[in-house]
């Protein structure tokens, strides 16, 4: 089984990204919390001691290289028959160095055509967010980091929001906001105000981007929200509503969509994970993708109905006594190395475009 997967992966890497472009196509967008992708170096200004060769997690070169290839395997598996995922939001990466290694130590760099941008935030552990993008289908226009400073807690330090803007093949402008909202440490209710504040900032940013746009400017907010989509931080502060898809692949009437942002709810059912994260048998949709209303109207760039899914392949999970569905195959359980991919499953959507 492993050899067959390796052969298919090699053929895909050699051929998949080289098919000709046509006037119509699709972009694959992913969001993936990769669980603590640290390098092997000690950064004294950050609390990264656990992830050093002599640290509590025994983070060795062999384990690091294995992790890089596992991430590459997931991304390669999530591509289509014609190309790799076009835009990949990565959560829990330490710095630009690990992304350079991801592209240079695995087949991704030679075949996928990725470039990247990553934050350099104030998180105490040095955790950041990043975006991989295929330069063939996303022309970078600009990027900036948006630091979160809480007026009610000036000492709190967390990950910034990454805003990336680019042109897609339709000629439309797509703004992506990659986020890793404050954790639930200290309790969900006690920490909720931090996530609410972050969502308020996101709402202000996205509203400003969409104001006065002529329908060819779009927004995606994606990443790890450290909370379910129905929680107040998302529903109230971000102002995002669940997108109820119509049957038959047709878009709901535009005048029925009143919010600016909609959560693209992943498909549920047999063979689909109940959530992206499982803790003691309880599944949660911590990872989310929210789209602007402009992507739901059937324009030159539009969301493909029914394409939102929790991306899962059997090699990414493992059996658990606490869940009837395989749970994510983690890299670590506490300080114990399990050798898996991540403690999250990624999300994947498709956007259809028409060239002008």
Question: Could you describe each region identified by the protein language model?
Answer:
Residues 8-18:
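Bacterial N-terminal signal peptides
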Residues 21-111, 117-129, 200, 317-325, ...:
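N-terminal, active-site-proximal structural segment of metallo-dependent hydrolase catalytic domains
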Residues 35, 94, 182, 225-228, ...:
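Catalytic metal-binding/acid-base residues of hydrolase active sites
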Residues 45-48, 172, 177-191:
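Active-site His/acidic residue clusters
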Residues 53-64, 84-91, 118-119, 150-151, ...:
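Second-shell loop/turn segments in exported
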Residues 93-173, 177-181:
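Structured beta-strand-rich core segments of catalytic domains in phosphoester-bond hydrolases
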Residues 192-214:
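A long, amphipathic alpha-helix that forms part
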Residues 206-220, 227-356:
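Metal-dependent phosphoester-hydrolase catalytic domains
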